[in-house]
A protein has these predicted regions:
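Conserved hydrophobic/aromatic packing and binding residues within compact polymer-binding modules
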Residues: 17, 31-32, 42-45
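Short C-terminal boundary/hinge segments that cap the last helix of small helical domains
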Residues: 66-82
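Short, basic-rich loop-to-helix N-cap that marks the start of a DNA-contacting helix
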Residues: 49-63
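Key DNA-contact positions within bacterial/archaeal DNA-binding proteins
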Residues: 29, 40, 69
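Recognition helix of helix-turn-helix/homeodomain-like DNA-binding domains
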Residues: 36-52, 77-79
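The alpha-helix within a helix-turn-helix
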Residues: 21, 32, 61
Length: 131
């Protein structure tokens, strides 16, 4: 019984992130940079000393250059709700993941659609210049 519990247990979120990095031959620094996450906060996520918000998990999905399925797995391992196509913002993010947009390109799509940006206030150059 105890053996089955160990096999069924999901790894902690930071263990999952580290495993993804190892599987992909990536270093956390590159993921954090591509995700447009502040460096020290990103390292705290990878160490497990900070817990991510749903938006931070989505940023990490873009950092990993994840497809929709991989992004859903990240959300699941973080204990967050999945992307839901009937929610306009989630549908836009799903579209961007499916089409391999970067985080900056995705922020521009969300901005153009007048939807909340991923991560709250981090606006891309294009978004900044359109103010």
């Amino acid at each position: 019984m105890e053996k089955n519990e160990d096999e069924m247990r999901l790894p902690s979120f930071n263990e999952y992130l580290s495993g993804l990095c190892a599987d992909r031959g990536e270093v956390p620094e590159r993921i954090i940079k591509r995700a447009n996450i502040e460096r020290s906060f990103g390292h705290q996520l990878f160490k497990g000393t900070k817990n991510p918000s749903r938006d931070t998990v989505l940023q990490l999905a873009f950092g990993f250059e994840a497809d929709v399925d991989a992004a859903q797995e990240l959300l699941k391992h973080a204990g967050m709700s999945a992307l839901y196509p009937r929610v306009k913002r989630d549908a836009a993010i799903t579209y961007c993941l499916h089409n391999r947009f970067t985080i900056v390109e995705t922020q521009n799509v969300l901005h153009d659609m007048k939807l909340p940006l991923i991560g709250g206030g981090k606006r891309s150059e294009r978004c900044e210049s359109s103010r």
